[in-house]
Design a protein with these regions (language model features):
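Single conserved hydrophobic/aromatic residue that forms the stacking wall/gate
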Residues: 286-297
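Non-catalytic regulatory/linker segments of enzymes
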Residues: 5-6, 203, 294
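Non-transmembrane, amphipathic alpha-helical segments
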Residues: 27, 31, 35-36, 40, ...
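A glycine-rich phosphate-binding loop feature that marks nucleotide/adenosyl-phosphate handling sites
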Residues: 2-4, 27-33, 69-70, 109-119, ...
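Cytosolic regulatory/linker segments at or just downstream of nucleotide-handling modules
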Residues: 259-281
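Divalent metal-dependent catalytic cores for phosphoryl transfer on phosphate-bearing substrates
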Residues: 75-88, 93-242, 246, 255, ...
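Generic detector of multi-pass transmembrane helix bundles and their immediately adjacent loops
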Residues: 1-79, 83
């Protein structure tokens, strides 16, 4: 349509009269020809886009937008098998997108990456706290800390395998692999250390309780790492006031900074500050909203 109007408008300028331009069958034919060519090109580009992305290892905004409708089979299966993880992922996506945009990173890519970052949890959903309903016994009570850690860490490997099997764009794989970096699974490490101390055994080996990594390689993956941790931790606050959330966000970012988790992604200190401010605002709003809903029920 645009091509037709452009060619026909040029004809009007030459003819100096709209009626004369309409009577000029040659001009109309040229306009229609250019319109048809443009339409065919659009179809060819749209049809070949998946092959281009796969060949060059890129993902376009068009493909990402198609994944924002959360109708992908993997997300539908995640919602069915691990509803707590699904809800967590949706909240993390909203937080991470805003934080990424606050530093000029790719918010859309970060949002879609957040949708899929925890898909591996659907393989053993009952072992993740967000899927353990009230009144249900925590399965970790009957497991040694080392075994619990292997299960928790395993969701990253499971997620990458699911991504491969379901042909998720390569650009989304790092969000699955890197969202925990090489961080420590602190709860089970402390449990192992406590048991080792009470049994008068040697100290627990910290390396056995760390994710294998890699650490975030991009700013987008680093943003997701922080947003993921903030959303999970904020749900444990009895009274999620603005001040408590601010302190929580600051502590999470500082801990990961000192642990070297941002060393490979070129994040600047002023960007970390903007990420912190964005997550403060978004977390406060989300927790306030949830508190209101809970109160109403």
């Amino acid at each position: 349509a645009i091509s037709f109007v452009a060619v026909w408008s040029a004809g009007i300028l030459e003819q100096a009269s709209i009626p004369e331009a309409w009577k000029n069958s040659g001009l109309l034919l040229v306009a229609l020809k250019y319109s048809g060519s443009a339409l065919i090109c659009c179809y060819l580009v749209a049809g070949s886009l998946p092959f281009i992305e796969q060949a060059f290892g890129i993902v376009t905004d068009i493909s990402l937008l198609e994944l924002t409708g959360v109708s992908h089979p993997l997300l539908q299966e995640l919602a069915r098998r691990a509803p707590g993880t699904y809800n967590h992922s949706m909240m993390v996506a909203a937080m991470a997108e805003a934080a990424a945009e606050s530093i000029g990173a790719n918010g859309l890519l970060t949002r879609v990456g957040a949708y899929f970052h925890d898909i591996g949890k659907m393989m053993k959903p009952e072992y993740f706290i967000e899927n353990i309903t009230e009144g249900t016994e925590n399965p970790h009570k009957s497991l040694a800390p080392n075994m619990s850690t292997l299960i928790i860490i395993g969701h990253v490997k499971d997620g990458l395998e699911l991504a491969e099997e379901n042909n998720l764009p390569e650009a989304l794989h790092p969000f699955i692999a890197e969202h925990h970096g090489t961080t420590l699974v602190e709860y089970f490490y402390r449990e192992a250390a406590r048991k080792a101390d009470s049994d008068h055994r040697s100290e627990a080996d910290e390396s056995n309780f760390r994710y294998p990594g890699p650490r975030p390689q991009t700013r987008e993956a680093a943003v997701l790492m922080v947003a993921d941790a903030v959303e999970s931790a904020s749900r444990t606050l009895n009274e999620p006031t603005s001040r408590r959330i601010q302190s929580l966000v600051h502590d999470i970012i500082l801990k990961r900074l000192l642990d070297g988790q941002f060393d490979d992604c070129n994040l600047q200190m002023n960007e970390l500050r903007r990420i912190e401010e964005s997550l403060d605002r978004k977390s406060t709003r989300l927790n306030s909203s949830h508190a209101n809903i809970s109160y109403a029920v």
